[in-house]
Amino acid sequence: YKRPRDFCLQYGVLEEMYEEDTTEYNSTSKSRKRKVRERFLPGVSPIVYSRFLLENAVFLSLNDMGKELPDYEEIPLPCTMLPEVKKEYDALQNCFRHLMSKEPRIGKRVMSAYLNLLSAYPDQPYGHEPIRNPFVPEEDQNVLSAPKDIGSADDLQPKDEVLLDLIDRKLQEGERVIVYTAWVRLDTQERLHKLLTEKGVKAAILDQKVPTVQREEWVDKRVHEGVKVLITNSALVETGLDLNAFTTLIFYNIAFNLYVFRQASRRSWRINQTAPKVEIYMLYYADTMQHKALRLMASKLSAATVIEGQISDEGLAAMSDCQDLTTQLAKELMRGLKDDVEDLAASFKKMAIFRNHPKPAAAEKYSAPAEPEEQLLPVQQSILLPVPVSYTHLRAH
């Protein structure tokens, strides 16, 4: 208790940074290494639960309150990019891989911009700014990638078609739908509102202009006016709102924020919900950055449920994983591994909550089509120069 550092060394995650002098003359001999600094990172060893918490803690959730709750399931829906969009996406992805391999100094500086571009481009393959070399001031000489514009806001993308089809089916079943969007720089909300209006669906956009304390009243008023689809950013409803009138929640795209996702996805799964089931759909393009991000989110969600007493092997394994999603996505992209759609669906299926209505979600019609085997471009290893290098070593005790 009085030695927090010793406790963290035993049960936490420690990052140790070293400097190693390597030259071409002593590459085969023992190089000089010295510790530069160390710091503790967010993360905890699974031993903490068996040693300190299991016999001394009570985990409560809504299921334990003695109230009748609806079934709850999160369902990933894969989509397939248009061929011309996929071609440009692959070019952008390979450019980033090449940059990280050959020019890691530049790659690390533009990593966030590239990951955001690779996440947003499949949804909106137009209107993106070029990615520039931060070390070259001349704008006519510093362009690293200039995404091609394919189509416009008037063109339907495959994800749009899946979304409209799903909304149409849910409205025919008498449900109301929430559509969450996350990319604030895209015109997604206005586009979707226009598409729904043209199909005769009454929709409304909840934006940040509505004060926080008035949002629930604003939503109730729109429901009484006959609104069937609510479009909003998930960050605007993450806390404090009960949206029981909407029993189908669709994430058109997802930001890399686990807390916001968990809060927004539970807005309708409340104690006073009278519907038999609440379904959460997550739309993504298969074998893209969206796919990788969603798979990492599933792993993080599994770890988060351990805190609530829902212990699983996957959750325990992810507890000591302290890296942020951006860093993990970059590593996943460099590895070049193809994700499995069925594995992703199974990961979310494990976290579903079924009580009195144990039936599979009606999402089979959106199963991913067969795709040709991916051909990955070879990525050469970075060349070690005869200069001092720094590296990070993580150890979870």
Give names to the regions the model predicted.
Residues 1-132, 173, 280, 294-303:
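Inter-lobe coupling linker of SF2 helicases/translocases
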Residues 50, 59-60, 180-182, 232-234, ...:
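Short His-Asn-centered micro-motif
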Residues 67-87, 103-230, 235-241, 315, ...:
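Conserved Helicase C-terminal RecA-like lobe
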Residues 202-291:
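Conserved RecA-like P-loop NTPase helicase motor core
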Residues 259, 269-344:
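A conserved SF2-helicase RecA2
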Residues 304, 313-318, 351-369:
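C-terminal helicase lobe and adjacent C-terminal extensions/tails of nucleic-acid helicase motors
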Residues 373, 377-386:
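Acidic, low-complexity intrinsically disordered tails
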Residues 389-397:
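Conserved small/polar residues in nucleotide/adenosyl-binding loops
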